[in-house]
Design a protein with these regions (language model features):
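Extended extracellular/luminal ectodomain segments enriched in beta-structured repeat modules
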Residues: 115-122, 195-196
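Bacterial Sec-dependent N-terminal signal peptides
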Residues: 2-4, 10, 16-40, 227-233
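Short catalytic/ligand-binding loop motif for oxyanion handling, primarily in non-cytosolic enzymes
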Residues: 40-42, 128-133, 207-210
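Secretory/extracellular carbohydrate-interaction modules
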Residues: 107, 121-137
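Terminal, low-complexity interaction segments
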Residues: 153-233
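N-terminal targeting leaders for non-cytosolic proteins
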Residues: 25-115
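Short coil-to-beta strand junction motifs in C2/discoidin
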Residues: 134-153
Length: 233
């Protein structure tokens, strides 16, 4: 009798453990800028805006101080800074209408919610028309890129203001026999950054002068993908 009761008690305990065990699922969020209200051939109307789970802004209310705007510009031929809001592809990633334009120093936040902190998975990146044509044709300040030249954006993750990791993306690379000048949207693996609540962008180039980098410090971004583990009962 005692043996039977013991077996029954263990069975009930095991069932209770299984029934109380929490299950989880992976939720994916993609920031594609299509939810930002704006007109065709324009940029975001305010100095800060929200897309998906992320907050974007320009610095000190002026883009010349750096930051990120949402853009629907599609000019792939006009040279110079007056065309600073266009991607060289003429559209967002996957032929979408809107995308982000980063001018250094740029950053965005993706605050934790009731389910915790987001993990960043990937992002699509391409050149701005301004930077692309400057490297291709040269300008008053920048040179025509040739053997040995390069231009990159450094994407760095932070969690509670502590750096997690960084990923370098070459927007132009003429080293070691290569002749890459990015003109398409490229998907970048950012899983090395891990869990983040903010992301920053910095730029570097082989073309430097007395006052620093000559290459226009711009990049276009789209389809920022995050994942989050959610507990389900």
């Amino acid at each position: 009798m005692k043996t039977t009761n013991l077996i029954l008690s263990l069975a009930i305990l095991g069932f209770s453990f299984i029934s109380c065990k929490q299950e989880t699922e992976i939720n994916t969020t993609v920031v594609d800028f299509e939810d930002v209200a704006m007109n065709p051939d324009s940029i975001s109307k305010t100095s800060s805006f929200i897309s998906g789970n992320s907050n974007f802004s320009i610095n000190d209310d002026a883009f010349w101080n750096g930051g990120i705007v949402s853009s629907s510009h599609n000019d792939t031929v006009t040279i110079g800074y007056k065309n600073q809001y266009s991607s060289i592809t003429g559209s967002g990633a996957l032929n979408s209408k809107q995308y982000g334009v980063v001018y250094s120093p740029g950053s965005f936040t993706c605050p934790a919610n009731i389910n915790g902190t987001y993990s960043i998975k990937s992002m699509m990146v391409t050149n701005s028309t301004y930077a692309y044509l400057d490297m291709k044709n040269g300008s008053v300040y920048g040179k025509i890129f040739a053997t040995g030249d390069w231009f990159k954006v450094i994407i760095k993750g932070f969690k509670t203001k502590v750096p997690t990791s960084n990923v370098e993306v070459y927007l132009a690379d003429f080293r070691d026999g290569k002749s890459i000048l990015l003109k398409t949207w490229k998907k970048i693996d950012l899983s090395a950054l891990g869990q983040v609540d903010s992301v920053t962008f910095a730029f570097d180039s082989s073309d430097k002068g007395q006052f620093g980098m000559n290459t226009p410090a711009y990049a276009c971004i789209d389809n920022i993908e995050f994942t989050q583990t959610i507990s389900i009962k």
